[in-house]
Amino acid sequence: MNQSIGILGGGQLGLMLLQASIDWNLPIHVLDPDAAAPCRSLCRRFVQGSLTDYDTVYRFGQDVDILTIEIEKVNVDALETLEREGKRVFPQPAVIRIIQDKRRQKQFFRDHNLPTADFVLTENRAGVAEALRQNPSFLPAFHKLGRDGYDGRGVQRISSEADLPKAFDAPGLLEKAVDFEKELAVIVARNEQGQLQTFPTVEMVFHPDLNLVDYLFAPAQISAEVDRQAQAIARQTAEAFGIVGVLAVELFLTKTGEILINEVAPRPHNSGHHTIRANVTSQFEQHWRAILNLPLGNTMAYQSAAMINLLGKEGHTGPAHYEGLNDLLAMPGVFPFLYGKAMTKPFRKMGHITLMDADLETLRQRVAEVQGAIQVITL
């Protein structure tokens, strides 16, 4: 395994990929626009530059044997050129191109008979109004930007005609709101030989205002039949894309028992961070196994787990201080992971905390305790 590997993106996902690569002494190069990116201190070689500029991505890719990503917002044209020239790019550029545009992603689900919420493609704000005029029963709905939405940004709830000014005046999709009971996720990995391996289904709880994961539980508290369906849909989705690497499949469990795909991510994902401690193979090691065409690892969980996102506290912008970290480290079965970001700002992802316990109900009770024990502030 002496082939050089490049990661497009040097944030926390890249950092955890790097940490997983150390045991195998993989030579990792990283491209990121931020001179203070979390990956900088760990990688073999760091290049500061744009992820969306063709020439920058192309030149970076010429210096490595294998390319992968930690974020979808990259220049796919450059990756396609590198792939044609013989570089190994995983996930494949064709997969990234579909997934980085929510319009193409949703159309892909429809074209491949993968269950998803009803939707209409829109070109601008006027198109949203016209779609609702033709089908008023579509409300309530969400208007989503086709490109560049991330961690809840690029999504607006449209509950009535009075909300139309909130719709984006850009290409997007209008999606009928799902009356869901739970939000689930399954991470699936696939290597070049077509071997597939899924991680246990998790149950995500989203922050009510920020539209990003507040905390999750693994495994999800769902019936065996719902779990079977969720796992099957994740596998079918990975097979439909033909992806090489890790794919996170976010799902809705509706109140009528139906399972619908919300969206997918072609990379390690927030819904799998707990696997670093809680599973035999982490999602990050599994990604390396997949793109290096190695046998996929055992995804069995050691214990039930919870994962809490550690966000910058509202009203605090500046050098980060982790108040309560010592108290947190004294708690049994609690494992904090800090991302090495020097500066905090409101709701910025600064780290995560994994909790493990033999009893899932005990974990549920401890989440609030852990959340109250630590905060990321400025002094």
Go through each PLM region and give its residues.
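Internal nucleotide-binding/catalytic subdomain
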Residues: G154-V249, L253-T256
